[in-house]
Each structure stands twice: as structure tokens, then as C-alpha cells.
């Protein structure tokens, strides 16, 4: 089973308490979700001091426009390891700036999936984050159709949810559930 930098879990950080937990963990990659632009650079620098690599969910940053210009600023000035977005122009900018480009894909219905597949074919993100991440058959289908590594996220509540997503072909699962972080952090330290 393939994983993302030997991490089956990508901690998704929603607040400073979770950020502190992440800094004190053995994970090397995490995702910043809700944050204000004024805090972002300091959070990224603090993570880097601890040897951590942060991916930023651009669509959830307050205080910046969620377009290619905002993405360019984040890539050049903030310098995260990667950018997550539902917007294909933001993904294109991340690819141009040579950081991880993660296309977030909400699976609402067949037509939404088909439209997303067109964008993905055009922009070729490095990863696709599939939401909700609890539908193994869709994870498998998107992986087969695109050949692009998949992150599964959304409604990941139990170990079983994580395992099913990984078995379906996801390289990692994004979750803000700190109990799952701890469980899979133990997995990380056992496999060293």
C-alpha cells in the first residue's frame, strides 16, 4: 500500500491547539484548514522550525482572494509545501510555482464528478483530495480514471473509515480527528 511520505494520515489542522499537537507529533506533513492570512506566515515558519511541512487549504484562508493572484502570493511569500483548492486556476499556479498542487473534489453527483474530471485532465494536479472520503468505490474509480494519487477527506471518523479509504487506493487520509492522528502516529513509530 502506497502512502504519502510514509504517512497514512495527513493531520488537518483547524485551530492552534491542534497545531501545537501536530508540532509535538512525529508527522512530517500536515494541512492547515481555517486560518487568517495574518497568522499564516508565522504558522508556516513555526512548523518549519520543527521540521514540519505544511499544505495550505487556500479556499479557507480568511483575508485573501481565492484566485491565482492570491495563490501566487502564498506560493512566493508564505512558501508552503503545497496548496489545496477546488479552483483549477489556483492549482495551475501551484504547479507553475513547483509546490504540491492538490485539487479538492466534492463528489456531489455524477455531473459534478464529470465536470471535475475535465478540470483534472486539463490541469493535472499532483494529488486529488476526494470528499467525502468514505466512499471507497468512488476513490477507486477516480484513481483508475486519472492515475493521480488520491487523498480521502471528509466524514473520516473511525479507523475503519481510514482503512477502507486506504484499501480503495487513497495514498493518505486527511482528518482533523486527533484520536485518529494518535492511532496512526503509533503506526508511524512502529514501522520505523
Swiss-Prot record:
Gene: glpP
Protein name as catalogued: Glycerol uptake operon antiterminator regulatory protein
Keyword RNA-binding assigned: yes
Function: Regulates expression of the glpD operon. In the presence of glycerol 3-phosphate (G3P) causes antitermination of transcription of glpD at the inverted repeat of the leader region to enhance its transcription. Binds and stabilizes glpD leader mRNA. May also regulate expression of the glpFK operon.
Matching SUPFAM superfamilies: GlpP-like
Reported consequences of knocking out the gene: Defective in glycerol 3-phosphate uptake. Noninducible for glpK and glpD. Is able to grow at concentrations of the antibiotic fosfomycin that is not tolerated by the wild-type.
Organism: Bacillus subtilis (strain 168)
Induction field: By glycerol 3-phosphate. Repressed by glucose, glucose 6-phosphate and fructose 6-phosphate.
InterPro entries in the record: Aldolase_TIM, GlpP
Alphabetical GO biological process terms: cellular response to glucose stimulus; glycerol metabolic process; negative regulation of termination of DNA-templated transcription; positive regulation of DNA-templated transcription; response to antibiotic; transcription antitermination
Molecular function (Gene Ontology), one example: transcription antitermination factor activity, RNA binding
Source organism superkingdom: Bacteria
Keywords assigned: Glycerol metabolism, RNA-binding, Transcription, Transcription regulation
One Pfam family of this chain: G3P_antiterm
Record has Ribonucleoprotein as a keyword: no
